[in-house]
Amino acid sequence: MTPLRVFRKTTPLVNTIRLSLLPLAGLSFSAFAAQVNIAPGSLDKALNQYAAHSGFTLSVDASLTRGKQSNGLHGDYDVESGLQQLLDGSGLQVKPLGNNSWTLEPAPAPKEDALTVVGDWLGDARENDVFEHAGARDVIRREDFAKTGATTMREVLNRIPGVSAPENNGTGSHDLAMNFGIRGLNPRLASRSTVLMDGIPVPFAPYGQPQLSLAPVSLGNMDAIDVVRGGGAVRYGPQSVGGVVNFVTRAIPQDFGIEAGVEGQLSPTSSQNNPKETHNLMVGGTADNGFGTALLYSGTRGSDWREHSATRIDDLMLKSKYAPDEVHTFNSLLQYYDGEADMPGGLSRADYDADRWQSTRPYDRFWGRRKLASLGYQFQPDSQHKFNIQGFYTQTLRSGYLEQGKRITLSPRNYWVRGIEPRYSQIFMIGPSAHEVGVGYRYLNESTHEMRYYTATSSGQLPSGSSPYDRDTRSGTEAHAWYLDDKIDIGNWTITPGMRFEHIESYQNNAITGTHEEVSYNAPLPALNVLYHLTDSWNLYANTEGSFGTVQYSQIGKAVQSGNVEPEKARTWELGTRYDDGALTAEMGLFLINFNNQYDSNQTNDTVTARGKTRHTGLETQARYDLGTLTPTLDNVSIYASYAYVNAEIREKGDTYGNLVPFSPKHKGTLGVDYKPGNWTFNLNSDFQSSQFADNANTVKESADGSTGRIPGFMLWGARVAYDFGPQMADLNLAFGVKNIFDQDYFIRSYDDNNKGIYAGQPRTLYMQGSLKF
């Protein structure tokens, strides 16, 4: 069998995959079934493997397949049925050319009587789901995680336009936590966004304490990260001012298989004690009766570039799905997450200059554990009706030691959350317009018990459950959310009006003071999304939506400068355009957020700070282009860039009026080049951001403790090279890379945490990746 040859036409540009056959080349093999085993992944790669395996000629327009994914192929197939299976969900269909040759073409648009109900707006985060979304939305998939050597959610999120995910800092200065902010919102513990995993709330108390000091999600168990910055608040909440982030877990394989991966990284110029390693494993498949299951594991061991940063994370999941027929589908998810980490803490300017890798806080340590159980059912009797119901239960412990001035504290906190969400969607026609009406309801009940024990720092003794305590509170919330929307397709227009209504009742009992406090409030959230198709590959979108932030347990009953604490409220506006012809993918959007009644908690003195009104305006844009469409010389070379301008201002009258919201760089973006010749992959990437401030006063001069002062901007570069050994070697893939090539010195600050100060950024770091499939 001779090597695969690639040809191109100039108009339109075409990739032609040809394979010379053995002596039987003159015969047609399309009528004979053969055993095939092709793993899910890139559609281009899957088609290439299938052509090589089955011995046929396939002419492919590169713009049709670029960027698309395939579910793989396992079993006995003739050529045509195998191609159809590989193309499932791609929007393409196979066309015979005769003489054992085939080509691909776009599948015809569905007729009105063939419209299919969507139901879940997030869905599987497919390319078409993103393209048809009437708002800013980006999905980063598993194959993209490795390009920059990412091992944490922070590293992936930080490359999305409008998202700022700083280095671990403050009480979230460990990999069990998550810090990110969208469009200038404070990134501390990611409390301004709705964060989900397969549609299930990630926070241990979604309404009463949404801060992700414990974020029980691991990158190794994910297929994709879906970030909906606008146009999703009518379906998802609360805390939706900063959009919706959904972590999509790995799909259950169609056929039984084992996949494993590992990455190790080392920062030679730092004081790293042990190389940091991350591991992931998936074992599972689907039987002929429609029952499938998969065991997922992701683990982390080692330390970061600073002293006192040792980390251990174990994240185990069991996913199951049973589809006895095309009408009924059952699914379940079980998770056990357990981790612990030392926290290096912030440094003063003097300590940073002496040794930026050191830690001056030997007692700070965090640990947490979460158990999750979810069960879902889908009933879809035909393509026009769909009913879903999902129930879930989580039990979470988060605890740790923290030095707070003259005391060392131990703060065990337990949380229990129960929820259920039925949803129904139906399509019907009214004249020339197609309507998909969705209606849903979510009930969520959460309860908490928080303690804080202490000992004197001077004693050098860590507190325990028998030590004195100064906090003993029990809190709870009952939340009801109803939503109704109508997706109207008429001509080239898609118009979706909707309404979400939330009713929340929360309480807190303080056993020390003997007080009982309650709050009850409603939040009506109207929304309107509009999408217009200029062509099949180019659309315009606009939307406006209401969103809100809940009254948190720490805010109940506390008087603040502006009066009694009220729910945070915001109104978001978006206008943008999206283009995707296969070779060029581009998006540009403008946004405006008017955010009222905004509050932040100060951990150093247990107070609530009223920032009041803030206004967030800006531009987000990104593009990816395949240079092979210009000339065959640049085949397999693609470039990409993203940029976000964010102007987040305090608009509350007072001394800080007009100042920038803390931790909101005005300019931020990425650049990169990918080159894939044959089995090799070469990646060059960079990210940059401008300066920012740490406090509402926008203090420029640095304080001695390092907590305030301008935070300088920076630009970092990374590179990676990988080789895919192919299916003959269990799809072994090995890669070597480096982060922060030029060893740029940069840092972030923590302002209102007990372990505030300067946190050094990641120095030059070498890493190695390996993965295989059986």
Curated annotation (Swiss-Prot):
Q: Which GO terms describe its molecular function?
A: siderophore-iron transmembrane transporter activity; signaling receptor activity
Q: What is its main location?
A: membrane
- SUPFAM superfamilies for the chain: Porins
Q: Its induction, per UniProt?
A: For induction, the TonB and the ExbB proteins have to be active. Regulation by the iron level mediated by the Fur protein and induction by citrate plus iron suggest that the Fe(3+) dicitrate complex must enter the periplasm where it binds to a transmembrane protein, which regulates transcription of the fec genes directly or via a further inductor. Induced 2-fold by hydroxyurea.
Where do the TBDR beta-barrel domain residues begin and end? Answer: 255-774
- UniProt membrane topology term: Multi-pass membrane protein
Q: Which Gene3D superfamilies match?
A: 3.55.50.30, TonB-dependent receptor, beta-barrel domain (2.40.170.20), TonB-dependent receptor, plug domain (2.170.130.10)
**Family from the record:** Belongs to the TonB-dependent receptor family.
- Name of protein: Fe(3+) dicitrate transport protein FecA
Q: Which organism is it from?
A: Escherichia coli (strain K12)
